[in-house]
Amino acid sequence: MIKDYFKIDKNPKKGLLPLEWAMLGYMAITVITMLFAFTKVVNPESMLWGRLRILVITLALWGVYRMIPCRITKMVRIMAQIALLAWWYPDTYEINRMFPNLDHIFAGWEQDLFGCQPALLFAKAMPWAVVSELMSMGYFMYYPMIAAVVLYYFFCRYYEAERASFVLLASFFLYYLIYIYVPVVGPTFYFDAVGVQDIAKGIFPALGDYFNTHTNCLPTPGYTDGIFYQLVEDAKEAGERPTAAFPSSHVGVSTICMLLAWHSRNRKLLFTMLPFYTFLCMATVYIQAHYLIDAIAGWISAVVFYFLLMAASKNMRCK
């Protein structure tokens, strides 16, 4: 019943939610990293102020929940932390830009494993408008898939809503930690910096701190007049940075979404998401956002993160 979501909880949770603690843990680790390398951080003041604002938002929403302890105010707390990922993602670039780029290593591994650069060849092999739009559609559906899983658990499986949200958010922060300390930018940035012709010849130079001052990338391959193509381009212009390539969190988190859908035993949810998930995974290489090894690492890491976090949260239940 809808009214249940506005009913005052008789035994409200007094402290922070586990996903809020996960955020604070990530915040603490990044602040410590910044302090150790403070002289190299480009925008330390804005980064610290941003963290302070997030802390204030978190505590303010906790205060609202304490005043009006119901399911809706708890959902607002959860959705706020998920929405704030849009701030945390580009923030990874502000930290990892201090470290030497590692794309030459990963592009070399890609060449050794597959004898080519799949990110260069995939779109060329399938340049058709229909394929391009399906790929862009899948890539665009990343955040809607996350929202669908969170909202499904909240409205249809409430007793595990807090757990599912924790697994998703903690997974994001684990990926973000990897991105900070393993600075890989992906084909669209690295190939643009080196030159596609040299990449095709198997030339993968080390670029050091090049991406500390350069953020140019290749134009996305595909059908440029497509609706979903334009939506993906708009998203790139709004928040894309030379960061977060290995492992692919698009593949990883969407895989965790699929595992949570499987855990819910709702076949309709699982099979509705399946085609979007399939195209999303393919799109990561098609649009040159990731190397193929990034996608493979995304699948492997997703399974590891999912089962570790599900085990850690097995006693997490909402009443």
Per-region residue spans from a language model:
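N-terminal transmembrane-helix/juxtamembrane module of multi-pass inner/ER membrane proteins
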Residues: 1-54, 72-146
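Interfacial helix-loop-helix junctions of multi-pass membrane proteins
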Residues: 186-189, 245, 279-305
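Membrane-interfacial catalytic/cofactor-binding modules of polytopic membrane enzymes
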Residues: 181-263
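Interfacial segments of alpha-helical transmembrane regions
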Residues: 75-80, 147-183, 188-202
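Structural signal for the C-terminal ends of transmembrane alpha-helices
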Residues: 61-71, 151-159, 261-265, 307-313
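Aromatic-anchored segments of alpha-helical transmembrane domains
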Residues: 27-36, 84-91, 172-180, 277-286
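Membrane-interfacial alpha-helical segments at the cytosolic side of multi-pass membrane proteins
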Residues: 148-153, 251-270, 300-309
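Membrane-interface loop-to-helix entry segments
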Residues: 131-145, 241-262, 292, 296
